[in-house]
Design a protein with these regions (language model features):
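Extended interfacial segments that mediate partner engagement and assembly in macromolecular machines
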Residues: 1-3, 12, 17, 31
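Short amphipathic beta-strand starts and helix->beta connectors
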Residues: 3-8, 72
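A structural signal for short hydrophobic beta-strand segments in well-ordered beta-sheet cores
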Residues: 10-12, 78-79
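Short, aliphatic-rich beta-strand segments
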Residues: 12, 18-27, 85-89, 189
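A general boundary/transition motif marking the beginning of the first structured unit of a protein
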Residues: 26-29, 96
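Rossmann-like S-adenosyl-L-methionine
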Residues: 33-35, 39-43, 47-208
Length: 208
């Protein structure tokens, strides 16, 4: 990993049945010998079923940049969680340790104590994993996430699992939740994962 080199990182995502998505991250917009990258990875790593090239020109801790190119194979992986199937793309936020995530989600559902008619807000919902788990027991679930790509994945995941009582919005939850409150929405349950300090003050009106 060197900022001056063409390649900065190789990120791997693992789906069901051990399928792997590989994302080659470079500092510039070109991937030298792209065809060779693909052929060698396919030859040496048969579990790789999807290859992307991502461009991250900014220095810092963020691994992925906004520019992405699909080089070969599947565009998404399928990963199961809590009995639901989720499509995972390079930008998707998805729990790394699934067994532990399922235990946490079960605990969240227990605390929520849903009976079928509640309105639930899932703030910072990512790709909708918690939202869709909640939707199986709630009347209405509203997922809010600032990353547009994640919201697109969340909507696809809802359709993929035939869940119709979950809706998703690409917005800053700390700003969007007070707007919902002003419009008359009174949620029965608010879920935040992770808890955001910025949201504590901005959304005080709706969370109290």
């Amino acid at each position: 990993r060197t900022a001056g080199a063409a390649s900065r990182h190789i990120m791997g995502r693992v789906g069901d049945h051990g399928e792997v998505m590989a994302v080659i991250v470079t500092a510039s917009g070109k991937l030298p010998l792209a065809d060779l990258w693909v052929s060698e990875m396919r030859k040496l790593l048969p579990e790789v079923v999807s290859i992307y090239h991502n461009v991250q020109s900014h220095k810092g801790n963020a691994i992925l940049g906004k520019e992405i190119h699909h080089l070969w194979g599947k565009k998404t992986l399928t990963s199961s969680l809590c009995g639901l199937a989720f499509e995972v793309s390079p930008f998707s936020f998805f729990q790394v340790h699934k067994p532990q995530a399922e235990l946490l989600y079960e605990k969240a559902l227990a605390y929520a104590d849903l009976h079928g008619g509640e309105t639930v807000i899932d703030a910072y919902c990512g790709t909708g994993t918690i939202s869709l788990c909640l939707a199986q027991k709630a009347g209405r679930v509203i997922g809010i996430e600032i990353v547009k790509e994640a919201i697109e994945d969340a909507k696809k995941n809802a359709a993929f699992n035939h869940i119709e009582n979950a809706e998703f919005y690409a917005a800053d939850a700390g700003e969007f939740m007070p707007k919902l409150y002003q419009e008359g929405l009174r949620p029965d349950v608010i879920v935040m994962d992770p808890v955001r300090a910025a949201c504590t003050c901005r959304s005080a009106g709706i969370s109290q």
